[in-house]
């Protein structure tokens, strides 16, 4: 007897439904939500941990998996190689160039996001002009560790983002055993966002410990919850929608550190309306990017 992928998915769906899982929470290969109608945009992705010797080859791998899951477009950031603390301008430029190469090769499947190290403020502003103001990128981030995002060193970068209406994706975590030096938490994001109420800041991973992260950012309306990069546990998406409203929740995967399937499942399997799922899976990110995409004449 030959058992194919479709048979396995149907059997899994039937088993889950029999155990009380709602039918609309189970995605099968025939699920219309995976046919592109949800217009899924992944707001948090990287080229690391993937097969391929060039950015173009690695992006081709992602595109094959995107097609299987009905993912229309990625917002692609640094991470081609293992993360380097205190990255130099040369290292940052190399990472940004790799992203732009991947996007240039697949312009209908990805947009680029700018990697920066706030330790070098002058270079950050120069790189913003090179890659966003005068280049193809449309977002800032994922800004990672080394400098807390609540630091004044971020202020000039955020002001540049505001000047072109580009959102910022800021890495955050709340670790039980303490964060790395310079690694931001959602508290730092809130402090930064309050100083810059016209900025749109995506709280990367929502701090990992999302039950706390959601509550921390709740009152700060220009901060958005990022679903990326944690286990696909039940309740994350539902709590974010309940506490923030679906308009402030954004789907991302953190691929290649996580799979598309496990992260999309957080949304498709959530007990929320299809309308809310459409906002989270792409509508909200397109709304945030609309000004810069329109200014650059890019598709949304």
Walk through the language-model features, giving the residues of each:
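Acidic/histidine-rich helix-loop elements
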Residues: 46-57, 83-88
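Active-site gating/metal-coordination segments in enzymes
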Residues: 72-73, 82, 89-170, 174-176, ...
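Active-site neighborhood of phospho(di)ester-bond hydrolases with catalytic His/Asp-centered motifs
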Residues: 41-43, 76-77, 113-115, 141, ...
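Alpha-helical scaffolding within the catalytic cores
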Residues: 57-62, 94-99, 124-126, 187-189, ...
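Histidine-centered catalytic micro-motifs
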Residues: 40-50, 169-172
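Mid-to-C-terminal alpha-helical segments outside catalytic/metal-binding sites
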Residues: 2-39, 43, 55-73, 245-248, ...
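Catalytic pocket-lining loop regions of alpha/beta-barrel enzymes
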Residues: 31, 135-139, 147, 151-250, ...
């Amino acid at each position: 007897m030959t058992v194919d992928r479709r048979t396995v998915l149907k059997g899994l769906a039937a088993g889950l439904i029999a155990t009380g899982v709602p039918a609309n929470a189970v995605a099968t290969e025939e699920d219309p939500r995976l046919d592109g109608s949800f217009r899924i945009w992944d707001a948090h992705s990287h080229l690391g941990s993937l097969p391929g010797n060039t950015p173009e080859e690695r992006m081709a791998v992602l595109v094959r998996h995107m097609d299987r899951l009905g993912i229309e477009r990625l917002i692609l950031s640094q991470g081609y190689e293992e993360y380097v603390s205190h990255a130099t301008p040369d290292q940052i430029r190399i990472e940004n160039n790799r992203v732009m190469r991947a996007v240039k090769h697949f312009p209908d499947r990805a947009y680029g996001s700018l990697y920066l190290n706030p330790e070098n403020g002058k270079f950050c502003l120069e790189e913003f002009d090179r890659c966003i103001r005068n280049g193809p990128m449309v977002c800032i981030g994922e800004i990672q560790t080394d400098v807390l995002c609540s630091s004044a060193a971020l202020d000039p970068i955020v002001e540049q983002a505001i000047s072109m209406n580009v959102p910022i994706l800021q890495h955050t975590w709340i670790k039980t055993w303490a964060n790395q030096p310079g690694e931001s938490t959602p508290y730092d994001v809130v402090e930064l966002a309050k100083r810059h109420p016209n900025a749109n800041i995506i709280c990367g991973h929502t701090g990992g410990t999302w039950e706390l992260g959601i509550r921390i950012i709740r009152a700060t309306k220009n901060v958005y919850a990022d679903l990326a990069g944690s286990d696909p546990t039940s309740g994350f998406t539902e709590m974010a929608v309940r506490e923030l409203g679906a308009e402030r929740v954004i789907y991302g995967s953190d691929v290649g550190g996580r799979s598309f399937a496990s992260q999309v499942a957080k949304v498709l399997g959530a007990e929320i309306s299809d309308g809310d799922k459409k906002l989270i899976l792409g509508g909200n990110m397109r709304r945030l990017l609309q000004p810069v995409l329109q200014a650059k004449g890019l598709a949304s």
